[in-house]
Amino acid sequence: MDLSLIQGMSLPLYFLLTLFFFFFATAKTRRSSSTGTLPPGPPILPLVGNIFQLGFNPHRSLAAFSKTYGPIMSLKLGRLTAVVISSPEAAKEALRTHDHVMSARTFNDALRAFDHHKHSIVWIPPSARWRFLKKTITKYLLSPQNLDAIQSLRMRKVEELVSLVNEFRERGEAIDLARASFVTSFNIISNALFSVDLATYDSNSSSYEFHNTVVHLTDIAGIPNVGDYFQYMRFLDLQGTRKKAVLCIEKLFRVFQEFIDARLAKRFSRTEKEPKEASSIDMLDSLLDLTQQNEAELTMNDLKHLLLDVFVAGTDTNSSTMEWAMTELFRSTEKMVKAQSEIRQVIGQNGFVQESDIPSLPYLQAIVKETLRLHPAAPLIPRKSESDVQIMGFLVPKNTQVVVNVWAIGRDASVWENPMKFEPERFLLRETDVKGRDFELIPFGSGRRMCPGISMALKTMHMVLASLLYSFDWKLQNGVVPGNIDMSETFGLTLHKAKSLCAVPVKKPTISSSY
């Protein structure tokens, strides 16, 4: 997400002076056009525009600006024009009414590593190629039929998470909840793709490097790079993000190639009398079938980029959301007790949470929605206008970076009562979902570029949170009190807690007859 590159932007004075003299002759203002007027916005500094006004948490800075300049405003980010949307009405107009011209995306320089921006389903513009990739990932991983087929896999990985947490309970130790949840989500993906675990909570394990590389790549994609705002400087890679991304992707592609080679060797050694068992076919098998068709639309290179997309996009959202949910519940212990009571009453004393139980847990569902309202994993939704368009009466020129501030919409007092308070009860009284139809709550986006993995993400979020609340009581470590929990954020591709939530699991009480 391009705006994530703003965080930490701090350039030496000599470099600013060099840029100033290099671009001064071509610097432009933004306020008017022969075909319309841009939205209002904060004053622009020479050359750099509004970059330094956004700070380390641009979602917060943009939300503050919107209180002065309105629900649609414009900024100058170096050489780029950006339009920021901060209301459900403007978001609906951009993502639904004008979806046909707002479905492209800007991307940062790190994503140019290995030409990922030319192969990624996340970043390539809408086209026949993009539709083919979306159809492929839906058909072989994210369709309702496939999600049902790997239900037992999800259950098994959640049970392994509960077993891991129980080991910490027996030792009386605190567990890093985000990391534990990340491992669960990661291994659901790796088993659906390769039929193996590729993540572990143990940092000494050989598989730790792979999942740590994915995490590192996600972080790199949120590091600022001057080349995104001054394209003439792109080749310098001043922050070194492209070089670091190349190293990460190279490692991941090497692992992917090992799996591909091993699978192909197994296929070649199989005789005609030894057909593939249906139960042993994973997504890699299905994708390899596509690469071996006559006039195949999917090459081996495409396959590796698609696998990269699935790992990067399919794991971080769940762990971040789960960590924020548990954090908010620790800060409102009566709500944690209420959720545990609901879950334990439905499941009973010695059962296991099943996916089929989730519809019977409305308060749990409300907690997930409220967490996504206050702490959307992706606080800013990026788009790019492919032609001139009018939104809320203002001009959005062709090739403008359009950003929907989901974080600001979720905390808008004109939309939500007591918007800064964690109140899951609000969703027991209103019919609002997170699937892109209700624009006051769009953590997964909306329109044709909405996250295709939303169903899988929601299934995993609910199962992980329900299982942790059902199986254990919880306390904070080292005498930390709820009111002193660090709520600071780290802005990037996803919105993480700056300080991980570590908590001590406690044996749950025996359910009384009053349940």
Curated annotation (Swiss-Prot):
Keywords, ordered alphabetically: Heme, Iron, Membrane, Metal-binding, Monooxygenase, Oxidoreductase, Transmembrane, Transmembrane helix
CDD domains associated with the record: CYP76-like
Pfam family, one: p450
Gene3D superfamilies, sorted: Cytochrome P450 (1.10.630.10)
Binding-site list for heme: C451
Bilayer topology annotation: Single-pass membrane protein
InterPro entries recorded: Cyt_P450 (IPR001128), Cyt_P450_CS (IPR017972), Cyt_P450_E_grp-I (IPR002401), Cyt_P450_sf (IPR036396)
Transmembrane regions: 5-25
Localisation: Membrane
Enzyme class: oxidoreductase
Record-listed E.C. numbers: 1.14.-.-
Cofactor dependence: heme
Coiled-coil spans in chain: none
GO molecular function: heme binding; iron ion binding; monooxygenase activity; oxidoreductase activity, acting on paired donors, with incorporation or reduction of molecular oxygen
GO CC entries: membrane
PANTHER family given in the database record: CYTOCHROME P450, FAMILY 76, SUBFAMILY C, POLYPEPTIDE 5-RELATED
Family: Belongs to the cytochrome P450 family.
Entry protein name: Cytochrome P450 76C3
